Amino acid sequence: MKIAVSSYSFSQAMHDGRMNILDVIPKAKELGYDGVEIVRGNQSDREMRVLAALLKVQSEEAGVPIIAYMVGADFIKNGLEAEVARLKGEAEIAALMGAPRMRHDSSAGKDAQGNSVSFEDALPVIAEGYRQVTEFAAGLGVKTMIENHGYFMQDARRVKKLIETVDHPNFGWLVDMGNFMCADEVSVESVRIAAPLAVHAHAKDFHYKAAGEYVPGQGWFSTRGGNRLRGAIVGHGVVNVPECLKILKAAGYEGWLSVEFEGIEDCIMALRADIENLREITAGM
């Protein structure tokens, strides 16, 4: 199994000035990763298009493919028509950098006035947005996908329902095995639901504290149900990563596995440990 790393995993080094986005591909290669994901930053559209062309050249010269482009979105808050138009531009950027996949978000579940919207009311709008974007992206050779993250669209049954509603061959699931815990689900059980629809996968691990337990130090955040999680090196937390990978493989998944690290350890040290652990886990698969 080919293992990639998300540029998001280097956030710590980017924030403290050790790295910038153009350092991601060389550093990923140095650490032994086979590919990279590029997460959209705060660049303007014009700047991002220039950067995409630079990253494509860098990727080709290094022999480290850009396997996916990740962007935010909110069809409810930002409006369907405007968000579809913007995301079509993002699909063009994905094609410019040579990324065959693009993940974009759905919604945080609030309208432009900050009022909560139910999943049932939001679903038709979100599904229509994904359908229009993926139809456009298909013409560029870019497959689009939704990731289970962001609380509102994080639990397995909601994501499955969305994919079934969109019902397009160019659209599928970026299965993040750790993120199910943010919706208080058991990762192994949720991956069983997700695996048949997987077009991409994230390896992510978390430390866990139940609601009411003492939570020491920094780095912890609340799940939807009030439990606490902290990002972990793969194999150090409570996510059964080997079993999740077995389930994906049994369902016929043969795609990339990408590391998304968000712990408090030094990110370079952690990413070195992540790939060592994943090579060991996947060696017999």
For each feature predicted by the language model, list its residue ranges:
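Active-site mouth loops of central-metabolism enzymes
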Residues: 6-20, 72-84, 116-122, 233-235
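Catalytic domains of carbohydrate-active enzymes, especially glycoside hydrolases
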Residues: 21-41, 98
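Conserved, mostly hydrophobic/aromatic
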Residues: 5, 28, 36, 59, ...
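C-terminal helical cap(s) of enzyme catalytic domains, especially alpha/beta-barrels
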Residues: 268-285
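Acidic/histidine-rich catalytic cores of soluble enzymes
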Residues: 35-36, 69, 128-238
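Active-site beta-loop-alpha junctions enriched in small/polar residues
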Residues: 8-10, 39-41, 71-74, 107-109, ...
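Short, acidic/polar
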Residues: 15-28, 80-92, 183-191, 241-244
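Active-site acidic/histidine proton-transfer and metal-coordination neighborhood
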Residues: 26, 54, 58-65, 77-173, ...
